[in-house]
Amino acid sequence: MNAPLISITRSGSDISVASPFHPAFVRRAKELGGKWDAAAKVWTFDARDEDDVRALCCEVYGTDGSPVKLVDVRITYRHAASGDRSAIYSCGREIARAWGRDSGAKLGEGVKLVEGRVRSGGSAKNWETVIDAGSVLVLRDVPEPIALRRVCDKEDRLVEILPSAAATVDVPALQAEREKLVARMAEIDAILSTQTASAA
């Protein structure tokens, strides 16, 4: 299990972002003028807004697709948590989802229930995803930047980063980043070569 896959690609005057669904990302993407491409399943933005788009990805997911240290996070729910007709999110990912009052609830990818229960509830019309009070969940491979921002000891929940022995480095992401950099260097060399030839 690796961190949620975030991919930012430039094509002409646009950039596209492929990322897992997150309501906070959707809301801010629209504010940045992003458009959802249903066929390609990506958000598209004006390439001039790339810095803002990357900042948004880091804010919501903890990474813009660049290699990042991953850690495991433990969340202890002192009070019940619920999502009104929606999933429950934390640390940039979906951690539990119901689909209706009687559907039951399913854990998100890379999430382990250590203690307690996740379930569906509410009414047929206003159903909920519910994490019961006293439940303990472990989220695997969370980007460290967002994990550090979520660490807290509050009345309703305790969020902790597990010991570093559980931390991993996202090797595939590092390899992918290296390939991108090598390709980009080749592009730059080609541009410089063309410019040098033109100047001569």
Regions found by a protein language model. Name each.
Residues 1-200:
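Accessory DNA-engaging acidic/polar modules
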